[in-house]
Swiss-Prot record:
<dbReference type="InterPro" id="IPR013025">
    <property type="entry name" value="Ribosomal_uL23-like"/>
</dbReference>
<keyword id="KW-0689">Ribosomal protein</keyword>
<comment type="function">
    <text>One of the early assembly proteins it binds 23S rRNA. One of the proteins that surrounds the polypeptide exit tunnel on the outside of the ribosome. Forms the main docking site for trigger factor binding to the ribosome.</text>
</comment>
<comment type="similarity">
    <text>Belongs to the universal ribosomal protein uL23 family.</text>
</comment>
<comment type="subunit">
    <text>Part of the 50S ribosomal subunit. Contacts protein L29, and trigger factor when it is bound to the ribosome.</text>
</comment>
<dbReference type="GO" id="GO:1990904">
    <property type="term" value="C:ribonucleoprotein complex"/>
</dbReference>
<protein>
    <recommendedName>
        <fullName>Large ribosomal subunit protein uL23</fullName>
    </recommendedName>
</protein>
<dbReference type="Pfam" id="PF00276">
    <property type="entry name" value="Ribosomal_L23"/>
</dbReference>
<dbReference type="GO" id="GO:0003735">
    <property type="term" value="F:structural constituent of ribosome"/>
</dbReference>
<keyword id="KW-0687">Ribonucleoprotein</keyword>
<dbReference type="GO" id="GO:0005840">
    <property type="term" value="C:ribosome"/>
</dbReference>
<dbReference type="InterPro" id="IPR012678">
    <property type="entry name" value="Ribosomal_uL23/eL15/eS24_sf"/>
</dbReference>
<keyword id="KW-0699">rRNA-binding</keyword>
<dbReference type="GO" id="GO:0019843">
    <property type="term" value="F:rRNA binding"/>
</dbReference>
<dbReference type="InterPro" id="IPR012677">
    <property type="entry name" value="Nucleotide-bd_a/b_plait_sf"/>
</dbReference>
<dbReference type="GO" id="GO:0006412">
    <property type="term" value="P:translation"/>
</dbReference>
<keyword id="KW-0694">RNA-binding</keyword>
């Protein structure tokens, strides 16, 4: 798998945004991705130094459409801790530039 296939999208929530102050970034990753693959992909794409990777599997939530019941897709979240001397990842575009 290539690096762009492993990292699918950043997770932007209140908790993940607060964790960015401590250089912890949350990404949705491929269901088959390992911690080592996620670490190498983040280092390659964003040119940063990763210290630690935590991964969790998130079950799909039950959703109803009338009397029919279905589930949202399951996903895999990776929380990536960058080193103290590493640059920050710019997830949001700067309006000043």
């Amino acid at each position: 798998m290539e690096a762009r296939d492993i990292i699918l999208r950043p997770v932007i929530t209140e908790a993940s945004t607060a964790a960015m102050d401590n250089k912890r970034y949350t990404f949705d990753v491929d269901l088959r991705a390992t911690k080592t693959q996620v670490k190498n992909a983040v280092e390659e794409i964003f040119d940063v130094k990763v210290v630690k990777v935590n991964i969790m599997n998130v079950k799909g939530k039950q959703k109803r459409q009338g009397r029919y019941v279905g589930y949202t897709k399951r996903r895999r979240k990776a929380i990536v801790q960058l080193s103290a001397d590493s640059n920050e990842i710019k997830l949001f575009g700067d309006d000043n530039e």
